[in-house]
């Protein structure tokens, strides 16, 4: 199992808690990233939104791509998974930008391709907002251009959304044939695109048995898409509540899901529901923690959480994308108390046959 975490570019993950003690500042995320690679974390996911989805649109948020470039220069081994929305980035230009950051990092840049859902944000920033299935048609073409720019000495493309003529991109990314491309989605259009064109499938929080069914479904789609493609990898997002006792952990969950505390973080709730296609309905209580994080069930003592993570590994998951609050302190606790237990529980599964 690899351990990743969401970089707190929004200053937290809890819509009901205005101040989580982790400001959306360069100083905080730099210290967090540098410490994280020292204590056993493998990857950070840098979300891309120009408005703050968690604390309300008026609150500060960090830009994903300039933050990634800065982190590339001040970290040594941490994988930098940067979210990118095709409607906000022309593909040839993004391919050039990403290749340069990948070189700065020594080959540690990867992409999380995300189809836009926030119509209000797109309007504010003067960006075209496609309807749902059109977004995935655009994304498929966008991926073809990015991959072509990364692989060909000269690349041309004439499609519905993009046109590139005899373009040169040098230097290429370090990773060959390309940096890893992650993506998530629950609609048929999203899942078929990911099975065909991406390297890894990311899922919001769900119990391990539900995740296992999704893994099996995506593996079958991958086989149908092209039997020659390498196997997909799988990641799950989750919010961690680790405490000395299960009762204390449950009390913390009750506190952070009290929807009466704050209204600012719910400003875009209806917009999000209207512009996504989900397999399950999401209540306000679910929405109170980012990315349905509590559904992963990473709540309890260190021993309980480690057992849950072992269940995810058995379900086919090889990457966790975790959220914590307050993040610096709780990541330290997770690294000290949970990761060693997970390694003990899963060592037998990874041991080579003799």
Question: Whereabouts are the PLM-identified features?
Answer:
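N-terminal beta1-alpha1-beta2 module of alpha/beta enzyme domains
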Residues: 1-74, 174-179, 353
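Hydrophobic faces of well-ordered beta-strands that scaffold small-molecule active sites
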Residues: 3-5, 44-46, 80-84, 109-113, ...
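An alpha-helical appendage that flanks or caps ligand/catalytic pockets
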Residues: 5-9, 38, 125, 132-174, ...
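Acidic (Asp/Glu)-rich catalytic clusters
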Residues: 37-38, 68-77, 98, 102-109, ...
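Conserved, mostly hydrophobic/aromatic
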Residues: 3, 36, 40, 71, ...
């Amino acid at each position: 199992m690899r351990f990743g975490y969401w970089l707190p570019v929004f200053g937290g993950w809890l819509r009901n808690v205005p101040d989580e003690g982790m400001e959306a500042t360069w100083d905080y995320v730099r210290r967090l990233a540098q410490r994280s690679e020292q204590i056993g974390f493998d990857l950070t996911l840098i979300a891309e939104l120009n408005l703050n989805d968690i604390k309300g649109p008026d609150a500060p948020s960090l830009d994903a791509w300039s933050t990634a470039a800065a982190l590339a220069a001040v970290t040594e081994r941490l994988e930098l998974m940067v979210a990118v929305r095709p409607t906000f980035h022309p593909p040839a230009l993004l391919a050039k930008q990403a290749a340069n950051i990948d070189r700065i990092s020594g080959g540690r840049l990867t992409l999380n391709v995300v189809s836009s859902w926030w119509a209000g944000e797109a309007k504010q920033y003067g960006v075209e907002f496609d309807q749902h299935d059109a977004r995935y048609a655009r994304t498929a073409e966008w991926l073809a251009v990015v991959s072509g720019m990364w692989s060909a000495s000269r690349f041309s493309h004439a499609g519905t959304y993009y046109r590139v003529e005899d373009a040169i991109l040098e230097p290429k990314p370090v990773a060959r044939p390309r940096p890893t491309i992650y993506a998530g989605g629950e609609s048929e259009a999203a899942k078929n695109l990911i099975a065909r064109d991406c390297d890894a499938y990311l899922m919001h929080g769900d119990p391990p048995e539900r995740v296992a069914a999704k893994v099996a479904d995506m593996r079958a789609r991958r086989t149908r898409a092209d039997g020659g493609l390498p196997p997909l990898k799988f990641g799950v997002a989750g919010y961690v509540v680790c405490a000395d006792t299960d009762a204390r952990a449950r009390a913390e969950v009750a506190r952070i899901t009290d929807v009466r505390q704050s209204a600012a973080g719910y400003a875009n709730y209806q917009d999000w529901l209207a512009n996504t296609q989900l397999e399950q309905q999401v209540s306000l209580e679910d929405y109170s923690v980012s990315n349905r994080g509590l559904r992963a069930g990473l709540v309890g003592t260190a021993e309980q959480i480690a057992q849950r993570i072992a269940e995810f590994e058995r379900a086919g998951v090889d990457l966790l994308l975790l959220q914590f609050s307050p993040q610096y302190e709780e990541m330290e606790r997770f690294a000290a108390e949970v990761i060693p237990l997970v390694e003990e529980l899963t060592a037998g599964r990874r041991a080579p046959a003799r």
